[in-house]
Amino acid sequence: MPSFYLFAASSEGRVYTLSTNSGAWRELPYLGLEFKKICAVPNFLWAIGGDRQVYVHVHGLDVPIRIREESYENERWLPIEGFSKTLLPTDRYRYSSADGSVERGVDKIRLPSMAWQWDGDWHLDLELDGQPLTEDGWMYALDFPATYSAKKSWNSYVRRRKWVRYRRYAALNSWCAVAPLHKDPTQEPFIDVAIGGTCVPNAPAGTLCVWAITAHGRAMFRTGVSKTAPEGLRWTAVPTPTGSELAQISVGPTGLVWAVLHNGRVIVRTGVTRDNLVGDSWLDVKTPVAASSLRIVHVSVGTDAVWCVTNDHHAWFRRGVKGEAAGISEDSAIGKGWVEMVGNISMVSVAANDQVFAIGAADRCLYHRSGVTSADPTGKKWRLIQCPMQISRTSSSLSIVSRKSGGSSSTPGSKHQSFSNLYSKEKEKGVVETCAVIETVLNSSTGSCSSNGGPPGLLKNERWKLSADSPPTIGSLNLNDRHKQRTAALRETSHASSAPAADVVEVVTGKFETQLRNPRAWSPVRSVGSVVGTEAHPESDSTVFESDSTHHGSDVFLGEDDDHTGSQFWTECGILWSCVASGAVTVDASNMPNWFNEQTSDSKVDVNANWRKDIVNKLQRRQEKLAKLQTVAKFEKAVELSSWVKSADARYQRPGGEFEDCIIELEWVSSGSGTDTNSSENSRSGDSGTFTVLSPDGAATKIQFPLSDITCVQCCSEAGAPRIAIHAPHLPVNCSPVKLQFSSDSEMEDWLSHLSSVCSQINTMVGKPAGNAIWITSELGDVFVFDPANMKAHQTSEPSEGYVEKMDVSTCETPYYNTLYNGMPCGTELEISGCVYDDADQIRFDLQSHSAVKVQPHRVEKHRVIALHLNPRFNERTTVLNSMKESEWLDEIRNDKMAFAPGATFSLKIRALQDHYLIIVNNAVYTDYKYRIDPESVTRLYVSGRIKLFNVLYRCPSLIVSMERMHWRQMGGHIKRIFNSGVDVVWGISCDNTGWVYNGGWGGMFLKGLEGSGKINPMIDTHTYYVYENQRWNPISGFTAKSLPTDRHMWSDATGRQKRSKEHTKLLSTHCEWISDWAIDYNIPGGADKEGWQYAIDFPANYHAHKKLTDCVRRRRWMKRCRLSSSGPWQELSQSKILDAALQVLDEDVDHSCSGERNTAVAAWAIASNGDVLIRHGVCSLNPRGDAWEHITSDQPLVGISVGPTGQVWTVARNGMVFFRYGISRQNPCGDAWQQVEAPAGVTFKAISVGRAGIWALDNQQRLAVRKEISRTFPEGSHWQFLPNAANVPPHTDQHCGFRSVSVGSEVWAISLNGIICRRCGITEENPAGVGWNLGIAGQWQNVSVEGYM
């Protein structure tokens, strides 16, 4: 499951965090500042320091916060001067925003604070709607409020170009001071702060709400806070009722605000919506008991829960609070009444999913409220959280440990052992150190060393005079260098900047080259031993902080697990907690982290104990002796394995037919072989079974087939209709797949688990698949795998003959067709034996290719292609050899030597050599035939005439993969996209863009425990349902739900073809649950007005946010979110959300890898949720998860990425442009820069895949394109060749014409729009586009990965 963090502050003011994937507390690096109050949301901490000022801490971001600043330069054409800087009085500003309403001079655009740095200089954006512009970047139009184009025309009277520059938040993983209210911070300090608002209904993504309370009891709201603006803009005072002085405040995920007054009462802020985050007014809420002595001292707000603590240390729960409706309903905001809880509590914190954490009043320990669910929001009892603690040497708590330990030593590597063993190790005697405030450290003039023996700290004035060079970016240092710098920085000084700032910030003016010595930005001033922000003068004030380049990346903790400085201790001493913040943690009440098991030295298990080794050795020797016994089969079996039958009522559907009632029956017969582990394959080979579909009365059999014929069992449920599909290609035509519908989800899952289990046993496929397996996902998110090792076992493989497939022709008559899935590459041989009938006039053997398809404006032309035509003609006493291209025969070759005769048997061998076919008849060379058509384009064998076939053998140097006979085994989990490297590194991306790593297991929820491994983890995914509301305008009543007969449905999907409604939208299974109500989606592409409407001239047109005079239709999108709970052999990749990923084993790594170690490095790239590029370091066979992300900037937000075997990286931008990364090498794995690859006019791509078989891309019209003329000197190729999407040409149909996804490795595989798995055949260096598709089963597939398949 994903990892989340629980934060807490100790009585010393130190901040600790506890991960859901860990069982130990870790301390955030101590920088000399203590904290009195902390609050958290994912990746953001706000706190009140010991100086009563507000601080913000941004952590866990793999992608830095990077904002793009834009300024449009406008010019107008004048009759004499031409295009000039002189504008009309009614025109927009010379430098303006996109709409011209705001002046945006490049010399006036400043950094928001010292926590930001410029990332590059001003430069031109040379792109317009996916099309490149000229070098000067001008866009032309008739007038300013008009549509711009890249080309100048005779009526272009205005032009503009866009200047862009990026700024980056440089204070990651460090505390940054927020500007105080007054120039003197001590005039009105802060006493409380709260953050929330992550789930304000319909608010833009990344919205945050921050409230604070000053020492004067005033409520302050921080405007402009978001995930891209961690500090916000300014403090805004929010009036409170007369006589109300606030003491404490809390903000929920939906923006609901509760505040505690000094008199013990609480007030609630109402009217908090996406358009008004501050809210409208305050409402008073009575205390739990109307008694003068009972006062509320603390309150915490969740989504649908509010908890408070009174002055008698009792906890209370508020009933009736509904966070989603709190902004529009006062009753939902204030609730209905109080419920008293048992416990002695001093403070409470409610998480976003209403889980509750608290601190005890007497023992100051941390507790969790167990059993909190939506049905029981108050929970059951308080559970003590007991976890080991990592504390700093500077903590006074270390003195307790040192006195307990008796002065023994500790090593940095000791924490890598189990916590049970840690406590038994002797620890180094601790030294109690007093923590000096920052003011004291800064004024120190002595050369005292830090506690870890580092160099003397710099003086205050010396620190301000450090080099003004820009700090190294994230991509400029490797991980080891960055870690050394971070460690050295910790040794060098015991304090850090609370408001990191750039040394010299460049602000461009005029010609974009002038530098101000000190730009206007947030500059720290010393106050009460801390560092707080104030507005600095750009010229007079000096740059007072060196840029903090040692803290970046996603690590919340300095150095993560490696504590080489020895500054951290692991201990079990009791910490007195003063504050807990659960806003960033999400835990499942039914699957809690391992936080509650007390670790003691008595519970440790020594796996290397002598007694344990002795027992294991004896068991192994006994097993070896049993394996050598020859008479094991004569012993009577302890348990007699017999067959079993499982039956149930269901509904059966033939393809294209209706569902009808039936009885299904599964019969399993076990071989019951011995228990010898060495003969497990033989024992399972005897397993068998049958599946039968009977009539409702059981009298007639509708269909019956052996379980060995099943190639795939998958769920194909629809809303309210639980179904499974059984694929068995050996069934009669139009009988596969067999679809069965059940009465409930539980019954469907029961049959799915049994069928999957027995099919895996019959095919001897359990556990981890081979590294070169093909992975695939279905529309429902199920993960399947094809293991070629299983198919290899069924093909005779001899060193001299390669792989052999024997085709069953016992019941076949001519004309005979059979697919040759590997074509006829060099070394392939086709052997045909049979008998010619006495009355035969002629016989025919053809090696056929896919028909050449040409799409004309009003028709589709198919042209036959035959690579080899062997035609013995007995009536003419000759044999004809020929080829056909584009339905026309070429020059034929006649051979009067007759090797075939009527009434005689024959043996024909066609062997593909380097440049010709060698034809052998009756073991004698008959002739050869030079290639006229590429032999690799051959797809099938055709035999006709009066002939009886005996055998057909197909020999090939490579594995013969029959598309219809590929067995797809379900692996478990819920994944949308899958990526396989070929060396046991498999990644996946779920619907909510969470990255997952395959851990080598098998099983999950779909198997119900019948099979599988122990590496199963819970998985949670979220999905959003959309419904479109459509309206048409009429002159009388305006926009109404009344439509024309030719219009789309008034409630529909995005295309308007499918009727949808909010009332009839149902969940797919019982594992899904709604987590929101229907709401208007204001973040729809193209924008929307205040009511969520989009306008257009007519329905199949482009939509925009504001109504125009010619707009006659409008629509708006409604959304509702659901959560799916599943399980599978996957673990979370990282905290960062990713849109796409690419895994590739580079050719240079294969050459240098050691086959004995089998630890091959993998190039791993990904696209972050904001469109930036990430490269994952440390990914290899033994470490599939890798170590850390490194960020690579991009001017355009990207959506797709792929890596080739030579290391080349290709990406697709959100606007459809394609980019190529050049400069990548072993010494420079990140490359140098992006180079645009121009696409044909009007074409926008959405996905790309690179492999040994070429560079393939998928555009927005679901067409596939292949890059032509690729060479070593020109690796990006010259142009794109598009494959035609012809209706009714397989795999296309009239309604589904195109492809969903494509994957390129040594072969090219794709998923068609109708869910069929396809493999491209006939790909050669001369023809990289291939000639046609070989089709597999129609499993409603979604995504396939063949990058690792060889």
Curated annotation (Swiss-Prot):
TECPR repeats lie at residues 23-59, 233-271, 280-320, 336-371, 966-1000, 1187-1223, 1232-1269, 1278-1322. Keywords: Lectin, Peroxisome biogenesis, Repeat. One of its GO terms (biological process) is peroxisome organization. GO terms for molecular function: carbohydrate binding. Residues 396-420, 671-691 are annotated as: Disordered. Residues 396-415 have a biased composition (Low complexity). One of its GO terms (cellular component) is cytoplasm. SUPFAM superfamilies: Concanavalin A-like lectins/glucanases. InterPro entries: Beta-propeller_rpt_TECPR, ConA-like_dom_sf, Galectin_CRD, Peroxin/Ferlin, TECPR1-like_DysF, Tectonin_beta-propeller. It comes from the Eukaryota. The keyword Repeat applies. Involved in peroxisome biogenesis. Belongs to the TECPR1 family. This is Tectonin beta-propeller repeat-containing protein. It comes from Drosophila melanogaster. The lineage of its organism: Eukaryota, Metazoa, Ecdysozoa, Arthropoda, Hexapoda.
